[in-house]
Structure formats: C-alpha cells, structure tokens
Curated annotation (Swiss-Prot):
Residues 206-399 form the GMPS ATP-PPase domain. This is GMP synthase [glutamine-hydrolyzing]. It is an enzyme of class 6 (ligase). The gene is guaA. GO terms for cellular component: cytosol; peptidoglycan-based cell wall. It comes from Mycobacterium tuberculosis (strain ATCC 25618 / H37Rv). Catalyzes the synthesis of GMP from XMP. GO terms for molecular function: ATP binding; GMP synthase activity. The active site is at C93, H179, E181. It catalyses: XMP + L-glutamine + ATP + H2O = GMP + L-glutamate + AMP + diphosphate + 2 H(+). Residues 16-205 form the Glutamine amidotransferase type-1 domain. It holds the Pfam family GMP_synt_C. Keywords: Acetylation, ATP-binding, Glutamine amidotransferase, GMP biosynthesis, Ligase, Nucleotide-binding, Purine biosynthesis. PANTHER family: GMP SYNTHASE [GLUTAMINE-HYDROLYZING], GMP SYNTHASE-RELATED. One of its GO terms (biological process) is GMP biosynthetic process.
Amino acid sequence: MVQPADIDVPETPARPVLVVDFGAQYAQLIARRVREARVFSEVIPHTASIEEIRARQPVALVLSGGPASVYADGAPKLDPALLDLGVPVLGICYGFQAMAQALGGIVAHTGTREYGRTELKVLGGKLHSDLPEVQPVWMSHGDAVTAAPDGFDVVASSAGAPVAAFEAFDRRLAGVQYHPEVMHTPHGQQVLSRFLHDFAGLGAQWTPANIANALIEQVRTQIGDGHAICGLSGGVDSAVAAALVQRAIGDRLTCVFVDHGLLRAGERAQVQRDFVAATGANLVTVDAAETFLEALSGVSAPEGKRKIIGRQFIRAFEGAVRDVLDGKTAEFLVQGTLYPDVVESGGGSGTANIKSHHNVGGLPDDLKFTLVEPLRLLFKDEVRAVGRELGLPEEIVARQPFPGPGLGIRIVGEVTAKRLDTLRHADSIVREELTAAGLDNQIWQCPVVLLADVRSVGVQGDGRTYGHPIVLRPVSSEDAMTADWTRVPYEVLERISTRITNEVAEVNRVVLDITSKPPATIEWE
C-alpha cells in the first residue's frame, strides 16, 4: 500500500519534522503545534535507530519531554549521532536535558523542583527575541541543566533552572526546559515557530491547499485505474475522505452509506441530501438495521460490540459490491481514519491499545479490500480545513464528531431496538437545545449515553418510577487527543433535563459527566 510518506512535496510527509517521543504525554500535542506553524510533523519513538531516522530525511527534529530522570536506570538515552545528522534540533524538557548531557553540558539534582506555572526570565538570544523579558511558562521537572554545553548561549533561566533555555544559532540547535506546546505557556507557539522558521529555515508549506493536492495525488498513485468503495457515516471524516478520493478518481468511486440502525434521528436523510448535493458522488444506501441488531443480540461488552459492528460493516460493503457494480470489481475500501484513531489503537511503537477503533482494530482478519486511508496522518481540525478547501458545505465540515459504531457504543449494555429509540429521542433533545443556545461552536461533541443496565429510583406524578439514567458528556477539544468537560450554562442543562425526563419514556434521571481526557476517553465505550 502506498503511504502518505511517499508524497514528494515540501514539508509534507516526505520530509517531516520528526518529534522524537521520550515517553511524553504531550508528544502528539507537539506534533500538532508544529503543524499549526504550517510545517508537517510526525511522532516517532525514541527507540528508532539512527538509520531509520536518517531514512526519513527529516527537515528538523524535536526531542520531546518524558517522565524519567536522565540519571535513572533504564531512562531513554539520546544517541549523540542524532545531533550530527546536520538537521536543526529543538529539545523540550527531558529532551532538553538529554541534549545538554549528550553535548557535554551538566544536568544535576538541584533540590528545587518546578511543576506548573513558573516565571521565566529571558536573557537574550534569538529564540525569545521580541518576547517579554519575564513571562509565564509551564514547567514539569526535578533535574535541571546547570551548565550549558560549550558553544551554547544561555538565553533563559528560572528559579529552579539556571539554564532554562540555550541555543547555538549557527549550529541550528536549541532547547528549552519548559513546555512550549501547552496552552499554559502563552508565548510557546511563537517560540516553536521561531525555531521552525528562523533556526530551521522552513517555509509554511503545510496548508490546506497543499495538503489536499498532495493527498489527491497519493490516492491517484495508490488506486491507479482501479475502483473504490467508500463508506459514508454522515460524519466529517468519511465525507472528506470520499471527496478527496472522488476528486482523484472521479466516477470510479462508489459511496455506500450503511444504515446500521445505530444512527441518530434524521442522519440518513441528511447524508443522502447534503453529501450528494455537495459532491455529485454515486451513493448507494444499504438498509442493514435488522442484520446489525441480530448480530449484537445478547452482547454487552464494549469491545465485543465494536468488533461486531466493524465486521458487519465490512460484510455490508461486500454485499454492496456484488449488488451495484454490475460485474466490475472494487479493489479498494476508503476509510476516514485519523491520526488520533491510529494512536489510540496502538498504532505506534510503545503505545498501548486504549480501545479498538471501528476504522482500525475492528476490521475482520479476512478483509477483502485494500484500505485507502488518506486522512490517517491528519488531526480533526486539519480534516475540516481540507474539507473546506474541497468546497464541502459547513453542514458537513462543522458537524460534531460521531463514532463509526454509532449509538451502539452509547448504550451501556445490550443494544435493542427499544433502547435505541429511547437514546435517539434523548439525543435529539440534547442536540436541539444546544443548538438553540448557540453552543455548537463551543462544544467539540456531546455524547448522550443510556445506562441501560442501570435502574434509578424516581418519583413522577404521584407514583414511584424505576427508570434508566441518561448521561450527558459535553467536551471541548481541539483534536480529541485531550479534552475537557464543557461548562454548559445551568439554565441549558435544566431545560435538557426537564425535557428528557418529561418526554422520554423509561428515563427518570439525567446526570452530567465532568471528567476530562485523560483519564477518561470521550466515549463511554
């Protein structure tokens, strides 16, 4: 399979900024911030060999933070040869300390730790030029660099870090003890941009137009003269993936919308109307609700449900191929897999499998298509930007994320037709009230979850009730890698709760999930 790494355009996956991951919780965030500076980046594990890194022909390296001390047994080591590749290098936190140690600087246990917001004093240099001399940054370290390597200028300090930043501009090397990638460092994005554009001399080539053009060429190369099928879920990911592929191969793409009976109210009609109107694509709708419900009967385990839905989804495609292609063959299956999907499904060295994604780990072993995943290196905001570049309407590109398995993973317990009707009704009320309150642009998504295996005692009218709770999970995020619960106004929550408990049978309690990600994922299952 031809991967995005084979595209040869400036600062696209052919020549990335590589974020070397030393175990940081923010490695993916660093990659995203680099992309915000319009330079492509990708994360690789610190265990990658020099040969592997050299083969990627990186235009720059960013050494991430990590939880270890450089003196701890088994701590990740920085191969000094990495600094001799002739490419610009920026070290962050642990990466900064490992870089200092490898170049002959001194890293010591100073006895002063800095965790959280810290005052940084800028002492000069180019990395922080034109920025405030005293500024807040986010620190998370116990060890500190006490002496910079020979030939490096100390350009910042803090109470617990005598050398909080250093640079050797002529060698295109720099490092910072703090975390420029987090929002708690107000000038962090400017520092990253200065390294990328001034130290590394990189242009701002990672733009929606360039991304779209590169991905279209990638698809043409991979599919050639073949035919493809794309599964539409109604969401932005599959819609943008389909639009890209159609732009590449035209009417050799057949879009299939599988109505698995796990959709929200009105979604089938919306897909058939909005997507076809925007693209003119060939669309076939498969009514498979009964098949999915039969397969899910008696299954309550989240992973079991995900894998069943993924398996049935592919089977529905195989049936569509036989029925609608009139003897032709379709060798390729287009999916809207994103970078966070791949990461959460254990798609990189050293990553743990959090849950099987419908687009990734839920596919059957006997898959009969070659996968085409043009978006698998993109974050959600980049997908939306590409969609707008392709001319898709806001009704599609601004739609809140909705999981491929649909309401099947928003019912905690067995999925039945009655439970789906209950959840679908509650979900429609929530969406209606959030839209009426003008909150759609403030909320990344708001899963509505039915606790079908839980009964809650209540009083309605003069009688005792024994109904199910509904959970509201409004979250704010930029890319789904991390998320915070959204502070929905109380009066909006009150309207939602009142309407659900009055209008939805079997529900007598509405609760609010106020957990961030991490530790919780956005979806309950």
